[in-house]
Amino acid sequence: MSGTTLLIHDLEAAVSPKGSGPLRGRDLGELEVCSPASIAVSGDRIAAVGPPGEVLRDHPPGPGCETVDGRGKAALPGLVDCHTHAAFLGDRADEFELRCRGAGYEEIHASGGGILSTVRATRAGSEEELRAATERHLDWLLRHGTTTAEVKSGYGLDREAELRLLRAIRAAGDAHPVDVRPTFLGAHTVPPEFSGAAEYVEFVVAEVLPEAAPLAEAADVFVERGSFEVPEARRYLEACAGYGLALRLHADQFSERGAVPLAVELGARSADHLESTGGEGVRALGQSATAAVLLPACALFLGLPDPPARALLEAGAIVALATDFNPGSSFCSSLPVVLNLACTRLGLSPAEALCAATANAAYVLGLEGEVGRLSAGYRADILLLDAPDWRYIAYHLGGDHLAAVVKSGGLLPPG
């Protein structure tokens, strides 16, 4: 009896990053394109991708196998959003209007708005309200083809609220088709009840981290003026590493503060943002295993300089893309929009952008070999595009060409 449980047949093309592991530097954008193609799925895994005749011969559909007609469609790996703040309550529409009238993001933050505005709204919510809101935000991500997403805490900033957030993130992930990887962003900014960053970090390390660590897979810190400098970030990250958490850093968003050298020194999985990163930081990332996660929707939303994507690639860096979805500085839940911005503003090709939001984003989350490619043995997370060319996912700004989503081998219902 055949083990094939889903057969997607006669696709125009199946498109996937080449090889295994992250694609560095100029290798970003190396694709395997099979045209025409069929994909056989067994359970939650891809069994084969190849010419239709070969796939049908080697993986014939058995009793109960679901079949999908792929004619006129292209298959891509499910997108991986490796940097989101999707667990929050409230919004910051009023602040958006203030910025439209000329107020700066840092100015709003310094006056008690920004992150702290969302902290107040999030602290006031119940765990059930947070779970429901996170699931709603995951719906938005999935609608645009994201099948795996990192979700950070960081809008609680006290013991009970941070733990409540992490529990809500995990509960939302358990209930939702999108695979959720939780990150403890205990050092997002300093809440007003603390006198300074050093005092707050000691509180987090002593009172929050021991209970937060089992609920998370990674830890993150915002290294920036007005938030945390390198000494506090080092203290926090080294403590988190002691609990086995992978390390992430918000780095060089508004100014260079030494975050990139710290990320490389500590072997962090990623340094994210990098709008202000100079030549030394670019070279350091190019020689390291720390990925550069670029967030062009945030740069656009705040009117910041674009991160140095091509310089990072020329230096040999591992470049990934993400939405930075959050209510204040990047209210964007669409990775295809980010792919377009990566092409039009950062100078990436559509192939480079696709690889950065699949294989390399999977690497950031420690999921290389699991998601981000259409290859035998990988999880069967597959997007079907109804478009003349697979590049429409980046080319058509705001377009809606997603015909179907397969998640862990199951065809999801429309919408």
Swiss-Prot record:
Positions of 4-imidazolone-5-propanoate binding: 92, 155, 188, 253, 329
Entry's Gene Ontology cellular component terms: cytoplasm
Binding residue positions for Zn(2+): 83, 85, 250, 324
Chain segments annotated as transmembrane: none
Binding site for Fe(3+): 83, 85, 250, 324
Alphabetized Gene3D superfamilies for the sequence: Metal-dependent hydrolases, Urease, subunit C, domain 1
Domain of life, source organism: Bacteria
Keywords for this protein: Cytoplasm, Histidine metabolism, Hydrolase, Iron, Metal-binding, Zinc
The protein's annotated pathway: Amino-acid degradation; L-histidine degradation into L-glutamate; N-formimidoyl-L-glutamate from L-histidine: step 3/3
Record InterPro entries: Amidohydro-rel (IPR006680), HutI (IPR005920), Metal-dep_hydrolase_composite (IPR011059), Metal_Hydrolase (IPR032466)
Residues bound to N-formimidoyl-L-glutamate: 155, 326, 328
Co-factor: note: Binds 1 zinc or iron ion per subunit.
GO process terms (BP): L-histidine catabolic process to glutamate and formamide; L-histidine catabolic process to glutamate and formate
Class of the enzyme per the UniProt entry, highest EC level: hydrolase
Intracellular or extracellular location(s): Cytoplasm
Enzyme Commission designation: 3.5.2.7
Keyword check for Cell division: no
Principal place of residence: cytoplasm
Function: Catalyzes the hydrolytic cleavage of the carbon-nitrogen bond in imidazolone-5-propanoate to yield N-formimidoyl-L-glutamate. It is the third step in the universal histidine degradation pathway.
Entry similarity comment: Belongs to the metallo-dependent hydrolases superfamily. HutI family.
NCBIfam families cross-referenced by the UniProt entry: hutI (TIGR01224)
Protein name: Imidazolonepropionase
Source species: Rubrobacter xylanophilus (strain DSM 9941 / JCM 11954 / NBRC 16129 / PRD-1)
